[in-house]
């Protein structure tokens, strides 16, 4: 197999792990595209993306156009003479002229089993929906949003204790090896592109802080999924004692909840059981404002008066109540 001349486009840590795999492979990374440096930290100093930092460590030329829609940026990219462009969480739209520039086009690493969960938050939405599995899809990019032909897919069972953070780590391990395997198939001409079935497609909408507020009227099963899906961001939470309480770990209890949704049924070292629309959600690890995340047993030692059985927790905004 003749090594490929690769352009890589990506920005966050997830992308950097794929770039590292390419650097370690027999292929040649001839250039890296990453989003412009952004202000970060308390001093708001400009900070390079993880992808840019890794590229500079290996003396790989870095390009940071604000857009790839202008002709100068497109001409600069074309002049590099890449065989293929690998795109992983880049964050900029690639116009058709860019998709057509490399000899083998552009391929993307997407964090779901396409065509399910196209879009911005596939890992989180798989948890949110209660999917049994997720995975990585390597696809040939076209002008649509994650609509290109699929080249290779991996599968990863979703476990009960998985969160978005843990799935992110698992897929960040699966993705690079899948990418290297797909590049080998493309170089040898042994891959058969598989069109996506539009009837099976759905979209992973971006997450919002508002969506992460717990609504105790929902079934405990759904709230449990949300706690896992929104960990680490935006973190499931509910208002109580004029504070926003974050929930990092919870479980479902089948104990009958005769009380109104949001009522604390019990509070002990096993957790705080809260009545929901169906069953009870047991809060196991929570975080009070200005504090670290703590096991409920430790929280109760310090703030047991906040969580006495019979207490009614908020979790529905007035606007929600008006619509109910």
From Swiss-Prot:
Annotated InterPro entries: Fmt, Formyl_trans_C, Formyl_trans_C_sf, Formyl_transf_N, Formyl_transf_N_sf, Formyl_transferase-like_C_sf, GART_AS, Met-tRNA-FMT_C
Disulfide bonds: none
GO cellular component, one term: cytosol
SUPFAM superfamilies in alphabetical order: FMT C-terminal domain-like (SSF50486), Formyltransferase (SSF53328)
Catalytic activity reported: L-methionyl-tRNA(fMet) + (6R)-10-formyltetrahydrofolate = N-formyl-L-methionyl-tRNA(fMet) + (6S)-5,6,7,8-tetrahydrofolate + H(+)
Alphabetized UniProt keyword annotations: Protein biosynthesis, Transferase
Binding site for (6S)-5,6,7,8-tetrahydrofolate: 112-115
Family to which the UniProt record says this protein belongs: Belongs to the Fmt family.
NCBIfam families: fmt (TIGR00460)
PANTHER family (UniProt xref): METHIONYL-TRNA FORMYLTRANSFERASE, METHIONYL-TRNA FORMYLTRANSFERASE, MITOCHONDRIAL
Protein name as annotated: Methionyl-tRNA formyltransferase
Organism listed in the record: Shewanella loihica (strain ATCC BAA-1088 / PV-4)
Lineage: Bacteria, Pseudomonadati, Pseudomonadota, Gammaproteobacteria, Alteromonadales
Gene label: fmt
